[in-house]
Amino acid sequence: RTQNQLNQRSDQVMTLQAGLAQWTADLDALVQPPHTQALDWDGRALRIVRRSTTASGDGLLVVAWTRRNVGGKGQWLRWQSPPLTTRGDLQVAWATAAQWAQNPGDAEKRLEVAVAALDEWKVFYFRTGAWTNPLSSDGAAPPPPLPGAADAANKPAGPDLVLPDGVRLVLTLPADGAISGTLTRDWVRLSLAGGNS
């Protein structure tokens, strides 16, 4: 019985570590196609456009992370689209990821993976020198216009197209888990970190 409990706790720790590594890998592989939202936190899910996990010519992926009650317990979940090669496919997958986080059907659930037990979670963006709520307009100012650009092209990207400098993940893990309490994980955009996250 004791060995069984130790094995179960060890599995929980390894699964959480793998989930956190995948979270970091998803953010490290973040790409922003022109005029396309590549990162979005809506208070329920974090959606990311990222490079494919295989060869670079295999298109892009949309991944999403959320917390949902599964069998009466909070669960941290990850969803991933199939490889996408057209803008239309990307838009459909982006919308599907939002739908999955809110009210998934069987088709969406087939593409999800349960990561870890989770009581609650929060996401913050690092912008203009401070951690802010992504749903707040604080710190979400668009970049300054490019000098010499035509008026139409000089229009700055809206806040939803401006990537933050960092993403903070705050997980509240259940008291009965192998690891419990609050866990905070910060990620810094590779272009700012000199190649390290």
Which residue ranges define each predicted feature?
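Residues embedded in well-ordered secondary-structure elements
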Residues: 37, 54, 107, 158-160
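Solvent-exposed loop and beta-edge segments used for protein-protein assembly and interaction
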Residues: 40-42, 57, 161-165
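Type IV pilin-like appendage domain
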Residues: 43, 49-136
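Short linear sequence signals and composition-biased patches located at protein termini or domain-edge surfaces
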Residues: 116-197
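Short, glycine/small-hydrophobic-rich surface segments
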Residues: 27-50
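Aliphatic-rich helix starts adjacent to a transmembrane/signal segment
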Residues: 1-24, 28
